Amino acid sequence: MLKQPSAPHKPIIIGSIFILTLVFLMTFFGGNLFQFFGLIKISSTSMYLSRLLFWLSLCLIALYAVKIEHQKLLLWEEKEYPITFQIVALVLLFLTVFAGVILIQIGFTLAGSNNKSATLAKIVLLLKKDFILLLFTAITAGVVEELIFRGYLQPRLQIIFKNPHVSIFITCALFGMMHYKYGTLINVIGPFFIGLVLAYFYWRYKNIKIAMLFHFLWDFILLIISTNSTHQ
């Protein structure tokens, strides 16, 4: 029988450390791994493979949770809400994240910081030519990233540290660091802020589906706008 632990035990600690290590390695050495196997660092093939690696990681984490921890992937019981609540929640999430991202953009612009990512520009050009890859990228971000960072890691770190705010900060810092590969500070701070919003939402309302749907829609809309405003 699967049940939620009230105190940290060894498998949960090991699993959390494994995820922290995995995110670190993927952030700083993921591109080099593709180059080691003779693949171009930024190409359709490497993009598809990297997304598939995310899904594989999620499957392994879920397997670890069930077989080793003897817990569900999601420790927090999913709460259900009426459709009106879900719509209002999505709208408020969009408004909150949009306002925050705009303020971050303004702050970096006033500070004279470089907000342009050459890596991201190359990715956008690839996605402009391949809508399936664009859709797959957005779905992967919405589903896999939320299930790993918010669904798996956040509740377990809360058990370990016995403090929701510490667990939220750590998962959001990791979420931001994962975007370090784009090469600019704003590409770390922006996701960190978005992670904060989604982490506190999940902590408060215990509904991962709304967080996943928002994350997917946010990335999908931004990618559509970016590809349509980019000239080859």
Model regions: which residues?
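Membrane-helix interface segments
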Residues: 82-84, 130-131, 161-166, 184-185, ...
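Short, Lys/Arg-rich, polar N-terminal cytosolic tail immediately upstream
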Residues: 1-8
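Aromatic-anchored segments of alpha-helical transmembrane domains
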Residues: 21-29, 95-99, 172-180, 217-225
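Juxtamembrane helix-loop-helix connectors linking adjacent transmembrane helices
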Residues: 39-45, 72-141, 232
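Alpha-helical transmembrane segments in multi-pass membrane proteins
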Residues: 12-69
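Membrane-embedded alpha-helical segments of multi-pass membrane proteins
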Residues: 49-57, 131-132, 189-197, 221
